[in-house]
A protein has these predicted regions:
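Short, polar/acidic, helix-capping and beta-turn segments at strand->helix junctions
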Residues: 1-155
Length: 155
């Protein structure tokens, strides 16, 4: 049975799917003590296709990037569920790190990453407010528009 957080997400139309398997020599998450570190998740949707591909500011809009960041956050939540079995075990979202595939003059990375941050707050309320870093990068795996990683305090 889905926990309270997962039910809240479902009411908002968010359904968690099986998390993606790592594509190289790493694991999807590591738990140490009461912290869960989730590896970077690109913006792959439930159909296995990228939500947005290419560079922000050179063909990908802020709105498309925002939706991609939200997709990354959904993938983070899927990894958390795989790690813990229940999203209700998240005590708080500690930090998100976002990577935005950006044209050299693209300056709106923080607006893009709000897609991920907004979903965390929608899911966890005040426990979803977090520290965050947004970095514009020259490229991401599979030419994904956005990748997001996270650190979570868990019980």
């Amino acid at each position: 049975m889905a926990g309270t957080i997962e039910q809240k997400l479902a009411a908002q139309g968010v359904v968690l799917h099986e998390p993606a398997s790592p594509v190289a020599n790493y694991v999807g998450f590591v738990r140490t003590g009461n912290l869960l570190f989730v590896s970077g998740q690109v913006c792959v949707g439930p159909d296995g296709k990228l939500i947005a591909k290419g560079k922000l500011g050179a063909g990908v809009t802020v709105e498309q990037g925002n939706a991609a960041a939200r997709g990354c956050a959904i993938n983070l939540l899927a990894q958390i569920k795989a790690a813990l079995g229940d999203l209700d075990k998240v005590v708080r979202v500690v930090r998100l790190g976002g990577f935005v595939n950006s044209a050299p003059d693209f300056l709106d990375g923080p607006k893009v990453l709000n897609g991920a941050s907004d979903l965390m707050v929608a899911a966890f309320g005040d426990k979803g407010r977090h520290a965050r870093t947004t970095v514009g990068v020259a490229a991401l795996p599979s030419d994904a528009a956005v990748e997001v990683e996270g650190i979570f305090e868990v019980s």
